Regions:
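Mature soluble binding/inhibitory domains
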Residues: 22-301
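C-terminal motif of bacterial Sec signal peptides marking the signal peptidase cleavage site
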Residues: 17-20
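Bacterial N-terminal signal peptides that target proteins for export
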Residues: 1-10
Length: 301
């Protein structure tokens, strides 16, 4: 994919930002409307990466140097530094690009090296990796990170758009690469269910030149016995229409596809009794038309 560029017409001039919902105690959500580093334009030049907050190696893998360019980035929103667990972070990446460019760049990594990720002082992640291998990382060469939000130090989300990545792909306001990075959380209970509701989400992006949108609400049931996310329902508002997408069952810390809908998830947080689940969703309709994607964090109680 190196060096290819995607040119699309009919772009939106700005991306709508979602306000974050609730959160309590040390799980307070930081909304996307916050501006990074106190800069009204949300712009940082030659940023200095901040290492994850705890339990991490400070030495990034030399094999992944190409995924850590010293680029010029702009930010919209802010997030806390995400806490690692024994040097590991959970990483979810969902590209919303035409399939020929997005291929093999979806990441669902419940335990990835914290030293392979780059989180800026603004809270934005500009390098993402599923392992320490050179082939398993993707960096932002230059451009915007928007809809940056977090839930305490448990998880942060955002979207790369109006940007170019280290694969050489460029993308627009309505496209992008969505991510969620959180503290890996092992579940201890082996029976029962938890009700999950939407806590924070980024914008719904379009693979091609369709309208971007918002995720109005999300709900699901977490089955502690089967370790699955059941009856996931996503309510989408895009353009002048609203519709619902459903996934009957998908594995926690895994990937499932039903029809045109693919669901990725990682379990994150600090309380096994009240876990958070970062969910990535994407669709790939037949004939290469349409297709949307995004990320959402669910609070399960």
């Amino acid at each position: 994919m190196q060096g290819r560029r995607i040119w699309l017409a009919g772009l939106m001039s700005t991306a709508m930002l979602l306000a974050a919902c609730g959160g309590d105690g040390d799980g307070t959500a930081i909304p996307a409307s916050s501006t990074a580093n106190g800069d009204a334009a949300g712009t940082t030049t030659n940023p200095s990466p901040t290492p994850p907050s705890s339990g991490t190696s400070t030495e990034p893998p030399a094999a992944q140097a190409a995924c850590r360019p010293n680029g010029k980035f702009t930010y919209s929103g802010s997030a806390s530094q995400v806490a690692a667990n024994n040097g590991q972070l959970a990483v979810l990446v969902v590209p919303t690009l035409p399939p020929e460019y997005a291929k093999n760049r979806n990441m669902t990594a419940p335990n990835a090296p914290a030293s392979s990720q780059v989180q800026q002082a603004s809270g934005a992640f500009t390098t993402l990796a599923s392992s320490a291998e050179a082939s398993d990382c993707l960096g932002l060469d230059h451009g915007a990170v928007t809809e940056i939000q977090s839930v305490g130090t448990d998880v942060a989300i955002g979207r790369w758009n109006r940007a170019m990545d280290t694969d050489g792909n460029t993308y627009t306001d309505t496209q992008g690469v969505h991510y969620a990075v959180g503290t890996p959380l092992p579940l201890t209970a082996t029976s029962g269910t938890l009700a999950c509701t939407q806590l924070i989400a980024d914008n719904v992006a379009s693979r091609y030149s369709g309208d971007a949108g918002t995720l109005g609400s999300t709900s699901a049931t977490l089955d502690l016995g089967t370790r699955t996310l059941n009856n996931l329902t996503l309510s989408i508002n895009a353009g002048n229409s609203s519709f619902t997408m459903t996934s009957p069952q998908s594995p926690l810390n895994g990937v499932a596809t039903a029809g045109t809908l693919t669901i990725q998830s990682v379990v994150v947080g600090h309380d096994p009794a009240q876990p958070l689940v970062a969910v990535g969703y994407s669709t790939t309709p037949a004939a290469g038309q349409g297709g949307i994607g995004g990320v959402v964090v669910l609070s399960c109680k």
